Each structure stands twice: as structure tokens, then as C-alpha cells.
Amino acid sequence: MIKKSLLPLALGGFGIGMTEFVMMGILPDIAGGLDITIPQAGYLITAYALGVVVGAPTLVSLVAKRPPRSVLIWFMLMFAVFNALSALAPNFGLMLVSRFLAGLPHGAFFGVGAVVASRLADEGKVAAAMATMFTGLTLANVIGVPLGTYLGHNFSWRLVFLIVAAIGLLTAISLRQWVPVIEARPSAGFRKDLGIFRKPGLWMALAITSIGTGGFFAWFSYIAPLLTDLSRFAPGQIPMIMTVVGVGMTVGVVLGGRLADRFAPIHAIVILLTTMTALLAMNGLFATSQTAMLVLAFATGANALAMGPPIQMLLMEHSREAEMLGSSLGQSGFNVGNATVAFLGGI
């Protein structure tokens, strides 16, 4: 039975997952609407990812002494405003800025949210509680991304970002109603918190996160043109395939939580990185087979999100003196990989 207090974290994860991953499905629509090329539109993915990289440690450091619940509420209000700006952006330049701003609270929310989930979790169920939050992100790929892709193709991509903004506002309200007040743990100060960066184990975890997930983001950033140009799927079939990916992600994050609770996080990560390498290779080998790509869409999505809980636990293990800062770095690491491959793909 999922605790009611964890549901707002899942809802926030849903909104964040939708705004990040729906871009892959509506990239051609945005390109057409702003009169730019698809590779240029890919820079919007890079801008959002850079916002995550910058925002996660910066925002968390600024609010380290504040109660986590109030911090999460403010992050979601920022998220709502900046996604509304994306919906209203009249040109590529302003859209680029709005996507960067929308990315700022992303990693910070997951970083603080992971700490809140760990404090609300029953004994021995910390990774499972974190997985509940990440389940919202994966459900976005089952429901939100296909819906957003459909709306972007058939109505307007701007409507998609307005819906995301509304989800952010609803999350802020539910956080206030359902999440108990949790006192901030004493902070030694910003400079001392930065001492966690002297730990080799933290850098190892960040390298695993950014480099290890780069291949997945390279695949996912350009999944729509990959499926239409090489696999010969019709554009109208892309929402269905995004649903398949999302179902895989949902299954994967649950399995990842169980793996991380049962085994040492680093052991789980090694297994998952090995299988991800094999899956990405098969995506290249069987790109012209529609049947194979449907199976691989599910498996690749599952493997990618299964890495979330063990990576989050590994980061927290190496940053106990500044748990919110350390936890937020996971999303920075993920999006270093995301920003890099989206940029390289747009060249």
C-alpha cells in the first residue's frame, strides 16, 4: 500500500517526466511551429538539461536550511510558471530561455524529494519509497507523453506545456495538504557542504550517472525520427510506441527499487549498465525491424529507469553530511549526459 504522503512526490515526478520526455515526441511539431529545423529544436532538450544541471545543486544549496516540504512547494510553483512561459514563447530564442528556466527546479525537486521519501519510508523500504516518486516520472511516459504527443500532433504543442504547468500547480497544493512538516536537518553551511566533492566515491557515482546514461539519452532524444526514418513507423504510431517505452520505465523503476533494497547499489548498477550496453547495441542492429523495435522500446525503457533508485542511494551514501545536495546531484549527472548527447545529435 503506497503511503498517501508519497503521492504528491509521484505527481510532481509525473509533471517533470512529462515536460522532459514529451519533447522527444513533439520535437517535429515544435520545429514546425517555430520555423526551425529538427536539429535546432534538439537544442531545446539541451537547454532544459543544462537547467537541471545548474539548478539542482544551486537551488538546493540556497534552501538547505529550510523545511523540505516548503522547499518542494516553491520548486513546483517555479516549475508551473516556467512551463507556462514555454507555452507562450513566441520565438526560438525565448523558447530556449524558458526551457532552461523550466529545468532549474527539476533536479532540485527530485533531490529534496528523495530525502523526504527516505524519511517517510518504513524501515528497510527506503529505495522502494524513492521508487514511488520515480514511478510518477515513468507513468508520465505511459500516460503523459503519449497524450502530449497526440495533442502536439493534432492540436498544439503549446497546449502540452499549459497542461504541465497545471500539474505543477496541483502538485504544490497536494504537497501542502498531504506531506507532513519535516524539519530541516542542521546544516554546517554551504562551504562545508561542498566538502562532499572531495570524496572520490561521489565523483565515481556522478561519472556512472552521466556517462553511463548518455547512451540511453542519445537513443531517446531522437526516438521519433529514428522510428519514422529507419523503422518506417507512421508519425501517428509514435504515441503508441512512447506508451510502450513508458510501460517499460514503470516496470523498471519498481524492479530497480527492489534490486537496490536487496543488493548493494553499486552491484545493481553494474548489472544494469551491462544490460543497457547490450540493449543499445541491439537497437542499432535491428533498427529496420518494427517488431524488434517494439520489444526493444519496452526493454530499453525498463533498464534505463531501473538505474534510478540504486544511483540515488549510492549518491546519498557518499553525501551523508549534505544529503539534499548530494541527492540532487543525481539529476545533474543524468542531464549532463542528456545535454551532451542532445547537443551532439543536433550538430
How should these model regions be labeled?
Residues 54-93:
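Conserved MFS/SLC helix-loop-helix module at the cytosolic interface between two early adjacent transmembrane helices
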Residues 98-136:
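Cytoplasmic helix-loop-helix junction between adjacent transmembrane helices
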Residues 266-311:
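C-terminal transmembrane helical hairpin of 12-TM major facilitator-type secondary transporters
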Residues 56-67, 252-264:
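Helix-to-loop junctions at the C-terminal end of transmembrane segments
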Residues 92-94, 122-177, 222, 226:
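Helix-loop-helix hairpin linking two adjacent transmembrane segments in secondary transporters
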Residues 35, 67, 88-94, 232, ...:
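Helix-breaking motifs and short loop linkers at transmembrane-helix boundaries and internal kinks
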Residues 318-347:
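A late C-terminal transmembrane helix in Major Facilitator Superfamily
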Residues 7, 78, 82-85, 93-102, ...:
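Paired small-residue
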